[in-house]
Amino acid sequence: MERFDAIVVGAGAAGMFCAAQAGQLGCRVLLLDNGKKPGRKILMSGGGRCNFTNMYVEPAAYLSQNPHFCKSALARYTQWDFIELVGKYGIAWHEKTLGQLFCDDSAEQIVNLLLAECEKGGVQIRLRSEILSVERDEQGYRLQVNGETLVTKKLVIASGGLSMPGLGASPFGYKVAEQFGLKVLPTRAGLVPFTLHKPLLEQLQVLSGVSVPSTITAENGTLFRENLLFTHRGLSGPAVLQISSYWQPGEFVTVNLLPDCDLDDFLNEQRSAHPNQSLKNTLAMQLPKRLVECLQQLGQIPDVTLKQLNVRDQQTLVETLTAWRVQPNGTEGYRTAEVTLGGVDTNELSSRTMEARKAPGLYFIGEVMDVTGWLGGYNFQWAWSSAWACAQALVEVCSDNKVCTLLIKFVHKA
C-alpha cells in the first residue's frame, strides 16, 4: 500500500498542471492516466499547434449554470501567467485571430513543458493505470489501481468529459462525483459541427469545402461573427462550432452570409453603375461563385439583370442572404466535439479550491465540471486556472501536515 499527499486522475492539461504546481510547492503527488501517453488531447489541439490560451479571456466567455463560478480561478491565474510560463520555456507563439495564441512549432512543446514542470515537482506519473474502485475511509481515499492499493488524503479528478472518445474520454469523473453524492448535470457535445436534414443536405452537397465569413445567431440571441464552412455532413467552421454550445435540439439558427456588406445599398449602387449586369455576377463579387450558382439552381437567386430586379425580389434576396434560417438535424456528437457541456454541478464545489462540499478532500478541475469556454483557447485557460486554484488548496493541506510534524518533533526534542 502506497500513500501520497495527493493523487491526480487524468494526465491532460488540467491534471498535469495541477500535479506540477502542487509538487513544486511541497506535495508528494501521483498522477494517474489510463492512456499510453500523457497529453493526448493537447497534441491533437489547434491543428497540432495547441491554441493554449486566449488574450481576451473573461468570465463572459464561459457557459455554466452558475456563471459566477469561474470568476475566482480566472482572476487568480490569468492568461498572462500562462503566457509567462510559456516564455520561460522559450516556446515561440503567435496570435492567429481574435486573441487565439498558438505555438509556432508544435503542440508537443506544451506537453513537454507540462512534463518538465511535473519533473520539477517530483511528480510520479503512472500511465496505463486502470482505476477499479475509489473508496473513502478515515485515512482518506483508497484507490484500487492495477492490483495495487493507493491511499491519499486528497484526490483530484481531472479526467475530462466525453468528447473525442478515441483519445480516451470516459465518464469516470461523473461516476466518482455521483458515488460521493454530488449532482452531475446532463452532458452534451459542445463546439461541434451541425448535421442537416436530408433534403437540405442534398441541396448543399455541391458546396462542401466552401467557407464564407458570417454571423450566426442562436434563438437566445447569442451571436458569433466568424467563418462558416459547408461540409458533406452539414455545417462547420468556427461560427458553427461556437453557436453549437448555445443551440438546443429543434431550434433554428440565423445566418448572415454577408456580414461585411449592406446588400441593399450594394445592389442599388451596382444597378446605377451597371444596370445590364446579371444579378448572379454581381453577387459573385461578394460571395463565392459556387455558393451563388448553388443558390440560383435552388431558385433563391432570380436569373435577371440588375435593372430587371424588382423591389420585392430584392427584399426577398436580402432576407435570404442575410437572415438565412436553418434548423439543424443535430450535431456530429462527441466523436468530433471539442468539449463536453454540463458535468459536475459547480454548486457542489468551492470556487476557490475546487473541493467538493459534500466530500472533503475530493476535487474536480477542468472539463469534468460544468464550465465550458468558447472556441479559441478559453478551455485550455480554464484548465490552467482551475488546476492552479486546486493546487494552492492541496499545498495548504500539505503544508499544514508538515507544520504539525515539525511541531511534534520540536516538542519531543524540548
Where do the language-model regions lie?
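N-terminal Rossmann-like FAD-binding beta1-loop-alpha1 element of flavoenzymes
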Residues: A6-L31, L394
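Short hydrophobic core segments
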Residues: I7-V9, I131, L150-S163, L228-T231
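Glycine-rich FAD pyrophosphate-binding loop
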Residues: G23-S45
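An anion/pyrophosphate-binding glycine-rich loop and adjacent beta-alpha core
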Residues: K36-P38, L43-M44, F52-P59, A92, ...
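Glycine-rich active-site loop/strand segments that organize a redox cofactor
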Residues: R49-H94
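Feature captures the FAD/FMN-dependent oxidoreductase FAD-binding
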Residues: R76-K154
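A glycine-rich dinucleotide-binding beta-alpha-beta segment and adjacent secondary-structure elements
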Residues: L127, Q297-T372
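Glycine-rich loop(s) and the adjacent beta-strand/alpha-helix scaffold that form part
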Residues: K154-L200
